[in-house]
């Protein structure tokens, strides 16, 4: 399985405290929801799956940013977003591993042109949706 960035290193180098800005958090959530609309419009097949997975990763990343902001912190490193989730939600470790794998696949797509196999999406689609719903639920609890 994937190794996560050390949280202590994240705190030292990439994490800073910020004011909780509910409007900014809501705006980030809205951007993530618009990405979902795009996914729904283009549909998912063998031709589009790489870009669908990429967009799902971006949705998850945006929701992680919102989750951190809801807790009064901000990260300048995407891997620290995953590390934060792994540290604070140990019961959802398998989700953290999937997010890390999606990050890896997204980077391979963006920097090397390696397409994502449909089987990855097919195997993980339910978990991806559960991750998104769980993040939204946790953020809403923090904003109340």
Question: Which residues does each predicted region cover?
Answer:
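Terminal alpha-helical segments
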Residues: 1-144
